[in-house]
C-alpha cells in the first residue's frame, strides 16, 4: 500500500478546481490516466467500507459522466449549525438526487464523495472547472453536453460539518 503525492505550489490559481486540474494533467503527462474513473473526497471524509463496491456497481450499470453518493454528517449532533448542514445534505440526497435517479434525469455532484468518469477527464483535458462552486460548474457542463450524472444511495461518506458561522464562511 502507499500513496503518490503530487505537490502543487501555485499561489495565483488557488482552489480545489485548480488542484484537481493539476493532478489530472500530471497523471496524463505520466501515462497514468487510463482509469475508468476517479473518486474525489475531502481530507476529513470517512468513507464507508462498502462505498467503492456500491459506486462501482452503479457506475457499471450505466453510462455515467459522474456519480454522486449520500453525504452524511460526522457531527450532526454537535449543535444546530452542524445539524442544519446535515439536513441540507439529506434534502439534497433524498429529495433531489434520489428522485432524479429514479426518473432517469440528471443528478448533481456536491463538493465531495463523487466519482468522475476517466473518459470525461480525458475529453476535457483535465478538470477545467475553476469557479468557487466548481461542482455546480461541472454539473451544468454535463447537462449542456448531454452527459448523465447518476446517484448511488447505497454509497455513503461521512463529512464533518461546521459548528460555528466563522467556519461556514
Where are these predicted regions, by residue range?
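A short, conserved beta-strand element in the Rossmann-like catalytic core
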Residues: 14, 45-47, 72-75, 137, ...
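Active-site donor/metal-binding and catalytic loop motifs
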Residues: 153-168
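Short beta-strand-to-loop acidic/aromatic patch adjacent to the donor-nucleotide binding site
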Residues: 32-46
